[in-house]
Each structure stands twice: as structure tokens, then as C-alpha cells.
Curated annotation (Swiss-Prot):
Keyword Ligase attributed: no
Taxonomy of the source species: Bacteria, Pseudomonadati, Pseudomonadota, Gammaproteobacteria, Moraxellales
NCBIfam families tied to this protein: maf
UniProt xrefs under HAMAP family: Maf
Cofactor requirements of the protein: a divalent metal cation
Gene Ontology terms: cellular component: cytoplasm
Name of protein: dTTP/UTP pyrophosphatase
Family (UniProt): Belongs to the Maf family. YhdE subfamily.
Principal location listed in the UniProt entry: cytoplasm
Annotated site (Important for substrate specificity): R11, T86, Q188
Physiological role: Nucleoside triphosphate pyrophosphatase that hydrolyzes dTTP and UTP. May have a dual role in cell division arrest and in preventing the incorporation of modified nucleotides into cellular nucleic acids.
Subcellular localization: Cytoplasm
Catalytic residues (positions): D85
Amino acid sequence: MDIILASGSPRRRELLSRVQLEFTVISVDIDETPYQDESPEDYIVRMVAAKAEAATVQLNRQLKNNDAHIYQSLLSKPIILLTSDTIGVLPDGKTVLVKPNNREDAYRMWQQMSDSTHEVWTAVQATQLSLQPKRSDEFNNEQVWQIINQQQIIERTEVTFVALTLEMMSDYWDSGEPADKAGGYGIQGLGAAWVSRINGSYTNVVGLPLAQTLALIKEMNDTDTL
């Protein structure tokens, strides 16, 4: 099955490209605001499911508008739609760290992570889509992408920070790197200087647990051949 990565993250694209996986990219936009008292697991599962739903709607809109020329090679067989979301979780197991809204928000998160260990969670959903007759229009031969199978995984990695000073936080924010990253840091960039130890998947902290994602894709492909 061909693969569509529904993500605007350049880091996820880079990780999949490293293993020479062929895939098409689309970007989706959803509201990523956590609900009040929503647990980290409930939040991250909701995010990847919402991204998959938004991507499916987008693919069907392009199909209806005959604007799917870049996906023509995908129209004759099922596809795997990959969606992913990464968050930080404080030691209390309840506080979700998403992308900082501004400098003050970033400082607040970093102060909570300073000289301590937090977790980075990434959820990945593989959704198998197949072209099926539109249920409400069975006599016009119109087809739409419909979900026929989906699986999720959640990977957790422990990350320990050094003690952070105000100068370190100020310099890092001014670098421009933190703004689009969960927890406000990038372990693959300047943020690596803050990390004294990790326990678990490094690529999970970057934004996609690579080995686990490839295993999920293989499992989905194997299921399709049964």
C-alpha cells in the first residue's frame, strides 16, 4: 500500500525519508487546544484521530473537485494514512506540554522541566483508506475514501534536563527554534544542550518513533494481504 503522511512537520518527513520510505505529504490544520482536565493519553489519541479525519475529508474534497492529480497513482489501491502528535508530560503525569504560545509560556514550561525528568509522548495512527461507493449516492458510481482499518501506538521517552538559567532560556527563545515544538525545544537542534540523559527512543523525541512506526506500517500491510 502507498503511504500518505498527513503532517506539516519537516522533522517527521526527514525521519521517514532517512529510511528511503516513499510517501506523499499533505498538511492538515486542526484545533490542538487541550480540553480542561483532559489526560495526556486522551489528548494525544484525540489529536491523531482528528488529524486522520481531517486528512480524509481533505482527500475526498480533492477527489470531488478533480484536484487529485498528484494522487492519481493512489486511486487504484488502498492507502495508509499516517498521522502523529507529540507532547511533553510533566512528572505529575497530568500536565501536557504542547507548543509554546509566546516567550512567557515557554519560560513557564522550561522552569517546570529544569533539572528534572519529563516524558515525551508520541502517538502514531495508521489509517487504511480504500475507495468505496458513496453510501448516499450508490447509483451514480461516485466513490469516496473510507476508513477500513486503523491502529494506534503511543511511545514514551524519558528526558532529563540540566538546570536552566534565565540567560539560557532567553538565548534559546531568541534563536527561534522553540516556537513550533512540543515542550518548546528540539533535541535535534540547539535544545540538545539542555538534555543530560534520555531513556527510550531518540526519534520519538524528535517527533516520530521511527522503528515503532515502521513496524506499524508493516503490520498494516501484512493485515491487508491476509
